[in-house]
Swiss-Prot record:
It is found in: Plastid, Chloroplast. One of its GO terms (molecular function) is small ribosomal subunit rRNA binding. It comes from Thalassiosira pseudonana. It comes from the Eukaryota. The gene is rps18. Part of the 30S ribosomal subunit. This is Small ribosomal subunit protein bS18c. One of its GO terms (cellular component) is mitochondrial small ribosomal subunit. One of its GO terms (biological process) is translation. Keywords: Chloroplast, Plastid, Ribonucleoprotein, Ribosomal protein, RNA-binding, rRNA-binding.
Length: 72
């Protein structure tokens, strides 16, 4: 049998997820501005929900863009 590879959580268990922490939130969005899925980031279900809510709040407050610009 193959051993399953253990994913390291990018966020600590007790780390606070806040909409004002833009550097942390940018780790969980693509270049186009889409929220990365949980299977790609390795976070828990609760953390994914908190991240999605924080990213959406940051977008509404114009801290993060809804879509990325197409600058060449």
């Amino acid at each position: 049998m193959l051993a399953q590879k253990q994913k390291l959580a990018p966020i600590g268990i007790n780390q606070k997820i806040d909409y004002k922490d833009i550097d942390l939130l940018k780790l969980f969005i693509t270049e186009q501005g889409k929220i990365l899925p949980r299977r790609a980031t390795g976070v828990t279900v609760q953390q994914q929900r908190q991240l999605a809510k924080a990213i959406k709040r940051a977008r509404i407050l114009s801290l993060l863009p809804f879509v990325a610009s197409n600058e060449l």
